Swiss-Prot record:
GO CC, one annotated term: plasma membrane
UniProt keyword annotations, A-Z: Cell membrane, Membrane, Transmembrane, Transmembrane helix
Membrane topology field: Multi-pass membrane protein
UniProt source species: Mycobacterium leprae (strain TN)
Protein's name according to its UniProt entry: Uncharacterized protein ML1584
Main localization, broad class: membrane
Family designation: To M.tuberculosis Rv2876.
Cell membrane found in the keyword field: yes
Pfam families: DUF2631
TM segment ranges: 27-47, 52-72
Length: 84
């Protein structure tokens, strides 16, 4: 009778990525959250500029909102176990 257990993948194969033995292959999600907040800050800081039209402002606000949405989705998804 065949087993119904699925095969579990431990992550990264050491043959493919030698640095996994040193623990460098895991993505640090907190670092990416900080980078996302920094990117939002940079986008909103560019609102203060020497441009006359407001089309650029709407693009900057839109991209900052998009980054914020992705950041919050990732943060909440990890807390609730939806994303590993």
């Amino acid at each position: 009778m065949a087993s119904t257990e699925g095969e579990h993948n431990a992550g990264v194969d050491p043959a493919e990525v030698p640095s996994v033995a040193w623990g460098w292959s895991r993505i640090n999600h907190h670092t990416w959250h900080i980078v996302g907040l920094f990117a939002i800050g940079l986008l909103l800081a560019m609102l203060r500029g020497n441009h006359i039209g407001h089309v650029e402002n709407w693009y900057l606000i839109g991209f900052a909102a998009l980054v914020f949405f992705v950041l919050i989705r990732d943060l909440l998804g990890r807390r609730r176990g939806w994303i590993r």
